[in-house]
Amino acid sequence: MTTILRIDSSIKGEAAVSRRLTQRILDRLLEAHPDATVVSRDLAQGIRQIDGSWLGSVFTAPEQRTADQQEIARTADAVMAEVKEADILVIALPVYNFGAPAQLKSWVDHIARRGESFVYTETGPVGLLTGKRAIVAFTSDGTPLGSELDHASGWLRQVLGFVGITDVDFVAADRMVFGADEAMARAEAAVAALAA
């Protein structure tokens, strides 16, 4: 059975274009995988930023963790497990000031963990999360996908590749201020064309 992990990250909640787009992508995937399990995580509802306590918790052996460290590690491990168990990731990438939202960066920090999602070898890093697919819902008011102003999509593609997820598609509803209806129509066409 297919497991789909949906990651929303917009602070606009239900009004977010990226949320509408992740839903459309999810609907398209469910047409092909009607029995899929869907796991959703809304990062705007909160995800811990990594800090010294987080680092100390996840890299301390479980039997040596304090009670506080156990709680921190439990949450971090749950985020990691969601990605490990997913076959397909649907990730909202709303662009804020040319980059990704802070909460999406925090999620990436949770999943880019040495020994869990990648290892270092003599020849360089090797991602461990292979065999997965990611579909990214890229939305922006004025930043075109892939332009020199876009510091979000290349970053996310690189991070996903670093952890082993190299099958990555982008569906864009970009430059919304220059024609929201046209941007959404292009995005809808891209969703319809996705190989589910």
From Swiss-Prot:
Binding note for cofactor: Binds 1 FMN per subunit.
Top EC class for this record: oxidoreductase
Pfam families in UniProt: Flavodoxin_2
Reaction catalysed by this enzyme: 2 a quinone + NADH + H(+) = 2 a 1,4-benzosemiquinone + NAD(+); N,N-dimethyl-1,4-phenylenediamine + anthranilate + 2 NAD(+) = 2-(4-dimethylaminophenyl)diazenylbenzoate + 2 NADH + 2 H(+)
Cofactor: FMN
Keywords per UniProt: Flavoprotein, FMN, NAD, Oxidoreductase
EC number of this enzyme: 1.6.5.-, 1.7.1.17
Molecular functions (GO terms): electron transfer activity; FMN binding; oxidoreductase activity, acting on NAD(P)H as acceptor; oxidoreductase activity, acting on NAD(P)H, quinone or similar compound as acceptor
Record's protein name: FMN-dependent NADH:quinone oxidoreductase
Classification via InterPro entries: Flavodoxin_fold, Flavoprotein-like_sf, FMN-dep_NADH:Q_OxRdtase_AzoR1, NADH:quinone_OxRdtase_FMN_depd
PANTHER family: FMN-DEPENDENT NADH-AZOREDUCTASE 1 (PTHR43741), FMN-DEPENDENT NADH:QUINONE OXIDOREDUCTASE (PTHR43741:SF2)
Organism: Cereibacter sphaeroides (strain KD131 / KCTC 12085)
Record note on quaternary structure: Homodimer.
Gene3D superfamilies the record matches: 3.40.50.360
Domain of life: Bacteria
Function field: Quinone reductase that provides resistance to thiol-specific stress caused by electrophilic quinones.
Residues binding FMN: 10
Family in the record: Belongs to the azoreductase type 1 family.
